[in-house]
């Protein structure tokens, strides 16, 4: 592999600094939740989409809004409700009486960063309207394909399935999300910090007043993606990823293991994480760091395992413990 030129290295370092600065900006609005912030940045680098899951009130929506405010990108929000229609997301043809013609009115999906809020509160038919947009980066209305802007990222939030009024996401749609990030309740100290901020006048609806500013733009993102694409992967690392994913298919606790698409996703996220940490090659720790968020939504538990308290995370963690690590 040829050595990078000084100019290429400078561009890569500048892009890395810009994306690292996102953390600082988001921290002005969101206390803690660093793993979720990291996951959002990784998804941007991998051209992927993110599902954020947590109980109501843990700043899932605020986290995505802070990311949008930190980027020089267009953003729109859709609040998913039981009566939301697919055309409310993709857009529709509207009759213009003056011209006696139908014209296309784009829906909120025509943006760079789409916040799909509480995506599991709407029926599957509407959920599936995002499928083509997420996978093909286009929507088809009245037989006409319409490309979406680039970059395009769907950041969806959902409440745990056991909450009233939720619809489990179809497996096909879950697989379209690069990462599923769990947003836990804050620690005691983080919760104290949240209350202190609010007592000092923090308004989550006014991120500009909180000091959140754009620190990265499309050019930074393209430079970063180009650098990630050059991050090298040894045959041993590729084999390690495959062994982890094949082990999920053989687990007695699972009815559904990770597909080859999931293995590709794990390798992609590991490369992005390696680059973010300052390396141009992937090591096993990069794979381990992204295994849970990349794989937890791509496996399905057997009912008897679920009744015994087994979770996708515990199965994947056990697999990481037993699969031999390349040296």
Task: Identify the role of each PLM range.
Residues 50, 114, 152:
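Conserved beta-strand position immediately N-terminal to the Walker
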Residues 2-9, 65, 242, 248-327:
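C-terminal engagement/docking regions of AAA+ P-loop ATPases
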Residues 44-81:
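Walker A/P-loop
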Residues 55, 89, 157:
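P-loop (Walker A) phosphate-binding loop of NTP-binding proteins
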Residues 39-42, 95-115, 144:
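Conserved alpha-helical scaffold flanking the Walker A/P-loop in AAA+ ATPase domains
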Residues 96-101, 122, 134-231, 271-273:
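Canonical AAA+ ATPase core
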Residues 54, 117-118, 129:
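Walker B catalytic acidic pair
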Residues 13-58, 246:
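Pre-Walker A (pre-P-loop) alpha-helix and adjacent loop at the N terminus of AAA/AAA+ ATPase modules
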């Amino acid at each position: 592999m040829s050595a990078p030129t000084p100019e290429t290295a400078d561009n890569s370092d500048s892009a890395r600094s810009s994306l690292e600065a996102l953390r600082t900006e988001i921290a002005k609005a969101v206390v803690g939740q660093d793993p979720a912030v990291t996951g959002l940045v990784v998804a941007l680098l991998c051209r992927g989409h993110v599902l954020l899951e947590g109980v109501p009130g843990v700043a899932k929506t605020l986290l995505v809004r802070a990311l949008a405010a930190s980027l020089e990108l267009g953003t729109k929000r859709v609040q998913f409700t039981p009566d939301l229609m697919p055309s409310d997301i993709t857009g529709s043809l509207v009759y213009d009486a003056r011209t006696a013609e139908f014209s296309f009115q784009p829906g909120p999906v025509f943006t760079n960063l789409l916040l799909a809020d509480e995506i599991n509160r709407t029926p599957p038919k509407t959920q599936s309207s995002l499928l083509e947009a997420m996978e093909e980066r286009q929507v088809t209305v009245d037989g006409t394909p319409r490309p979406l802007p680039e970059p395009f990222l769907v950041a969806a939030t959902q409440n745990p399935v056991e909450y009233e009024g939720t619809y489990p996401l179809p497996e096909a749609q879950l697989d379209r999300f690069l990462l599923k990030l769990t947003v836990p309740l804050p620690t005691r100290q983080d919760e104290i910090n949240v209350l202190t901020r609010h007592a000092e006048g923090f308004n989550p609806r006014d991120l500009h007043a909180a000091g959140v500013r754009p620190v990265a733009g499309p050019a930074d993102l393209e430079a970063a993606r180009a650098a990630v694409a050059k991050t090298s992967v040894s045959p041993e690392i590729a084999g390690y990823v495959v062994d982890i994913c094949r082990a999920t298919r053989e687990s007695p606790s699972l009815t559904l293991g990770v597909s080859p698409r999931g293995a590709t996703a794990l390798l992609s996220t590991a490369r992005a994480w390696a680059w973010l940490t300052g390396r141009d090659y992937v090591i096993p720790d990069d794979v381990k760091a992204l295994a849970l968020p990349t794989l937890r939504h791509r496996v399905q538990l057997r009912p008897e395992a679920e009744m015994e308290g087994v979770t996708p995370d515990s199965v994947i963690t056990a697999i990481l413990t037993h699969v031999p690590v390349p040296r």
